[in-house]
Amino acid sequence: IESEGVETEIINVGSRVLKGEVDEVVKEAGDKVKTADGVIVGSPVYYASASGEIMMFLDRFFGAFGADMKYKPGSAVASARRGGTTSTIDDLNKYFQINQMPVVSSNYWNIVHGNTPEEVVRDEEGMQTMRLLGKNMAWLVKSIDAAKKQGVELPCGEDKIKTNFIR
């Protein structure tokens, strides 16, 4: 993403959630997202799904700051030794979709395989997928910025209709 001229910042939440700092990291991320143009959320795969730490963080984060995320591009990435990556991406993408965020993709599912960082960089297909994801994210962020500068208005919203299945 940075090679495309877009500034990035990494917030590592997993270890902080385990230390009981979930409220602090949610507030920190919420403060930063006000000026961010997009987000990429990543998770290792544990038991064929996203880590509990990232899910706890996202539940709290989007509960507090979901409205601030509207129309900001989002993408999910997953890393695993073997299986569970697509279900992890599905879990993470739901936060973007329910908050009206464009979901950025690549030329394959946004996954890498490896048990260590050294193994992951040897996953040539996965690394290509990540490079293309970065280019696509940078392109969409720049495109949205250009549209704003040209006066293109955001879509008109609607009040949320909620349906209970039991009446």
Regions found by a protein language model. Give the residues of each.
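Short, glycine-/small-residue-rich phosphate/pyrophosphate-handling segment
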Residues: 69-113, 117-131
